[in-house]
Amino acid sequence: MYSSLNIYNQPVTLAPTTVASPNAAYQRMANFWGLVEDLKEGTYKIRSEHRKYLNQEPRETDDAYDTRLARSTVVPYLQRIEKMLSGMLVRKPIRLDDVSDLVREQLFDVDLEGNDLNVWLYQTARVAISFGHVGVLVDAPKDGEKARPYWVTYAPKDILGWRTEIIDGVRKLTQLRLMEQVVESDGKYGEKIVKQIRVLEPGRYEIHRKNNKGEYKLHDEGEMSI
């Protein structure tokens, strides 16, 4: 008999072999993240997975099962709790005391996507509440006279792996791999989405991009100040 419980017993590969291979901690949680994502999408997503979440009884006909499936709904408790708890963080605007005018101006668009600090916090908190944690990278490009720091949010499924070492008695992060998607121009009017993995190590970075064969190859590398 089909059992949807098998999705929670997937083997964990302890030794990543490529830059795109997630580490063990990622693999242990990946199947549970899938359930959270499906719940966030609601009734139609859960119905589309049918027997994964709603098992067919041993003597139940296909027609009877389809009828029961069509009547089944998912109450959006997860979305309600997520919005409620995130909203509590921004019920009042964030106070900015002893902040320079330059920084205050930047906080009106913290992610270069038009979101101010309050909106960014609300959206980031929703991800953290749903999946248990969230990653934030503050990048500060050097090029350009008006270059400024900006914040990038990474959902747990985009944090492929990390390494830590004890250096001078302190545990420090020595490697971080982040999955990203960038939009590039394609022809005169079109655009395409390119998947890439950003590898950060002390003092340097690498960008690996996915090619037509589905492999990630080194696209760019350089030095950085952290």
Place the predicted regions along the sequence by residue.
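Extended, helix-rich architectural segments
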Residues: M1-T153, I167
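Structured, contiguous alpha/beta core segments that scaffold functional sites
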Residues: D139-I226
